[in-house]
């Protein structure tokens, strides 16, 4: 996202506590863009530290807020960690934004707010009824959406676009930046690439008895670079389009669903590398199948996911190879 923003002419300040990333990402950003963005290592739950960022950079116009804990399985085991991190950080930002004249916030929500959609509601539109969240992670996204809605409807002087991501995957095509999970990855693709590399002994596919064509879960996998382009178009709409509503919602996905098994097989075909995998029991909190109807983002934002799945998975493998070469994993 920082790359796309810089290339679109924005001045970028990155704020991260590095709990699930690495400072070396900044080097990759500079190699790609020629610009070393400003960086502040703070925890957004610390309101005083967050306020100092606004004081240090008084010209901030907009915020893209995706600092959050994001693993469904972990959230079931550590619910309070998720509620504290994901909810408190947003409240701190919303309280500080008007004080410093920040006009808009793009919020990273999730398709988890739809829960397990009824079959007749697939692919889900933004108007699809919200089902009960299947995990604390999903519930934090639902709560945060409601907080933003309530705050804006109270008359707060800011605008927001809520982006409901489906499943972001892949790495920048340069292989200079990508996902850097600390410890055991909670997301599918890093686990696939680490298993293919031999770092992990085997990949477990959680559940093969779902009501899907091959029995494994179905998700809508969106390339991170395509997603980053959506961030830029959303930010432009919030900051520059005076006619845009104070609050709007968009699904950000491909409009297609792929099963976990399809992901593994497509990865093997795209890279020529075999993955050692096995079936395991279902994982608590996982939904069976979901994919998005993204025509609203196509028409209103002028945005569409364009990268083929095989290219996305190849980018993830190229990134994993670079991590090995650099001794980072």
For the regions a language model picked out, list residue spans one by one.
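A generic fold-level signal
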Residues: 77, 85, 131, 155, ...
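N-terminal Rossmann-like NAD(P)+-binding domain of SDR-like oxidoreductases, especially those catalyzing
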Residues: 1-171
């Amino acid at each position: 996202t920082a790359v796309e923003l810089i290339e679109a002419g924005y001045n970028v300040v990155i704020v991260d506590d590095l709990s699930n990333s690495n400072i070396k990402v900044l080097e990759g950003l500079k190699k790609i863009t020629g610009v070393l963005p400003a960086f502040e290592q703070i925890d957004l739950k610390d309101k005083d530290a967050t306020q100092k960022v606004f004081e240090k950079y008084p010209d901030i116009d907009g915020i893209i807020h995706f600092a959050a804990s994001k693993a469904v399985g972990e959230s079931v085991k550590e619910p309070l960690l998720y509620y504290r991190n994901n909810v408190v950080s947003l409240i701190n930002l919303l309280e500080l934004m008007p004080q410093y004249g920040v006009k808009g916030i793009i919020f990273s929500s999730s398709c988890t707010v739809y829960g397990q959609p009824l079959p007749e509601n697939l692919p889900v539109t933004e108007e699809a009824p919200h089902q009960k969240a299947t995990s604390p992670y999903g519930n934090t996204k639902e709560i945060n959406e409601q907080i933003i809605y309530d705050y804006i409807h109270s008359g707060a002087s800011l605008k927001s676009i809520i982006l409901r991501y489906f499943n972001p995957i892949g790495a920048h095509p340069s292989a200079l930046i990508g996902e850097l999970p600390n410890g055991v990855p909670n997301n599918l693709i890093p686990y696939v690439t680490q298993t293919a590399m031999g770092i992990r002994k085997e990949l477990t596919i959680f559940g093969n008895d779902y009501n899907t064509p091959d029995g494994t879960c179905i998700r809508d996998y969106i390339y991170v670079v395509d997603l980053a382009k959506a961030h830029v178009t959303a930010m432009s709409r919030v900051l520059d389009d005076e006619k845009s509503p104070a609050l709007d919602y968009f699904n950000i996905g491909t409009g297609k669903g792929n099963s976990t098994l399809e992901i593994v097989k497509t990865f093997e075909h795209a890279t020529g590398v075999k993955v050692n995998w096995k079936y395991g029991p279902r994982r608590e909190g996982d939904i069976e199948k979901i994919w998005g109807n993204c025509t609203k983002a196509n028409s209103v934002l002028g945005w569409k996911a364009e990268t083929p799945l095989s290219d996305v998975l190849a980018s993830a493998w190229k990134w994993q190879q670079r991590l090995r070469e650099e001794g980072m994993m």
